[in-house]
């Protein structure tokens, strides 16, 4: 996992939560069956990157989502590496995160998708921005920069992927 996710898991451990880490197999992924075997009755969150930032290995996100569908477990995927490469679906995903810098948006902006049934609490209390999910004034220029970068990626995705493959 990317340090942004791994360090969050380590923080949860320091707060007294049990965290299970799974090692990737020879193909660089964690399989659905390995995740299924690691699930416990009290597992509340599974977090798996969509595409590995170092190897490019793509994880079976759709199958993991199907596995967790009827379980009391939320599913998060870090999609930062996948967003420019493929159209993503959020079917069965409770939380999806991505950072804008991978698609040439301003550094320091990203986005979070949250399904309507997934809980979320403000990290910092304060103003009522974003329906109370965050405190502080939104960085409108960065938001617009991310929006434009996302539009360009969607419009030119096939061309970009072909260029990546040729490199």
What are the roles of these predicted feature ranges?
Residues 1-167:
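Pyridoxal 5′-phosphate
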């Amino acid at each position: 996992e990317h340090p942004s996710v791994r360090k969050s898991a380590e923080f949860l451990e320091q707060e007294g939560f049990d965290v299970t880490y799974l090692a990737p197999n020879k193909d660089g992924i964690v399989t659905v069956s390995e995740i299924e075997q690691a699930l416990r009755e009290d597992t509340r969150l599974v977090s798996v990157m969509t595409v590995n930032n170092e190897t490019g290995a793509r994880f079976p996100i759709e199958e993991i989502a199907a596995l967790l569908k009827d379980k009391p477990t939320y599913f998060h995927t870090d999609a930062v590496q996948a967003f420019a490469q493929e159209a993503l679906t959020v079917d069965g995903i409770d939380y999806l995160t991505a950072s804008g810098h991978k698609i040439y948006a301003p550094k320091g902006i990203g986005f979070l998708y949250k399904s309507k049934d997934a809980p979320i609490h403000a990290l910092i209390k304060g103003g009522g921005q974003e329906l109370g999910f965050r405190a502080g004034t939104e960085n409108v220029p960065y938001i617009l920069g991310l929006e434009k970068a996302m539009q360009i990626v969607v419009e030119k995705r096939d061309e970009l992927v072909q260029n990546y493959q040729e490199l």
